[in-house]
Amino acid sequence: MIKVRFAPSPTGYIHIGNIRIALFNWLYAQAHNGAFILRYDDTDVERSKQEYIDAIAADLEWLDIQPDEIYYQSKRFNRYDEVAEMLKQRGLLYPCYETAEELDRRRKIQLSRKLPPVYDRAALKLTPEEKEEFESQGRKPHWRFLLPNFENNPLQTKRTEVCWNDVVKGKQTIDLASLSDPVLIREGGSYLYTLPSVVDDIDMAITHIIRGDDHITNTGVQIALFEALNAQLPIFGHINLLTTVLGKGLSKRDNDLSIHSLRAEGFESIAIQCFAVLIGTSQNVHPYPHQAALLKHFNLQDTSRSVTKFDIADLFALNSHLVHDLTYEEVKTRLKNLSIDGEKAECFWNAIRSNIDKVNDAVLWWKMIHDEQSFDPVALEDRSFVRQSLNFLPEGPLNDESWKVWTTTLKEKTGRRGKALFMPLRQALTGMDHGPEMGKLLQLLGREKVIDRLTIQGE
């Protein structure tokens, strides 16, 4: 069975780029009757917070992503210790005592000599006495994984290609000789991303790893680690990254692009799903009404190979399109939560939905209709016309035909036409020069409010 995973770090709110990875994995699992694993990468105990774990869970639920299994890396340290010890015993994980400053100096020297800034494995030359000396100075080792890029002598590396058939990008090749041995364990004993990730992928029988293409180099290292652990390799797929319109990478520090924030702002769940999945693919970003329809058009191979820019304006447009098609029954509960209720609520929704970007925006129109309003006065030259319009307002309750009858009469009596006729009335009654059809608004306002507002604006 196909098994995929989404492994967020609960160190902040996840953004649209993160959720794009989650959706690609979720839809891929759905399309192949597979399983979706949620794995919290919370090995950084100090920065990982329960509030972010809760927020990630809430975001996934809102986006209709339902994990089949949930794991926490912080509960698996014993397993990582076991694997690390085995690698140490085999000489594949070795201690290094250089400080960050010393390593930085070496890199600068290598670059000045036009050499690649690859770690030279100097730690492998240390004698037991030298290691003891470092320990006596209070230095604690960090541990590097010995990449298999040599024949007999690890100090003499040779070109060693790691290849895989990426399900998105096709054949990929990484030369392990061009990479430094990765640090798997920090000085303090905490684990970096690589070892826990590979161990979990093995233990959880992950068959497909679908992630951003910023992990391509990591994949070469991880394949070497999979092989060192005598494990079957998963299938890899790397999708293009999203950036801001300025070309900057998305970050958890950009809270306005977090799913938590976008949800609070009133964006539709399916709008974010469609946008995240279809942007940067060969398909148009279409406003599918639900996830099942989106799934039918999901294809991992449609992903572009170039970076894609995320423009919030495009998400607004997509959201608007979806909101305009929502029926009253679909939003009835949400409107009630916004205190939009009563016998006129359905008529109200049908009147205004084409003029809002988000369901929450309906509140502005509801208040415009029901609350006492203080609008900017109409233009001085239009006030006599507004006063005059009162004389020709149809008698009795206002209905579907009232606006047409009223404006037809005004056209005949005043000679006004087009904007000169309609705009002063709209501004007098709503305070705006745009909005829903006035015929529908007239009914919602009711005769008494129409008379009151025209009287005030005609003064």
Curated annotation (Swiss-Prot):
One of its GO terms (cellular component) is cytoplasm. It catalyses: tRNA(Glu) + L-glutamate + ATP = L-glutamyl-tRNA(Glu) + AMP + diphosphate. ATP binds at residue 252. Keywords: Aminoacyl-tRNA synthetase, ATP-binding, Cytoplasm, Ligase, Nucleotide-binding, Protein biosynthesis. GO terms for biological process: glutamyl-tRNA aminoacylation. Its EC number is 6.1.1.17. A motif ('HIGH' region) lies at residues 8-18. HAMAP family: Glu_tRNA_synth_type1. This is Glutamate--tRNA ligase 1. It comes from Bartonella quintana (strain Toulouse) (Rochalimaea quintana). The lineage of its organism: Bacteria, Pseudomonadati, Pseudomonadota, Alphaproteobacteria, Hyphomicrobiales. The gene is gltX1.
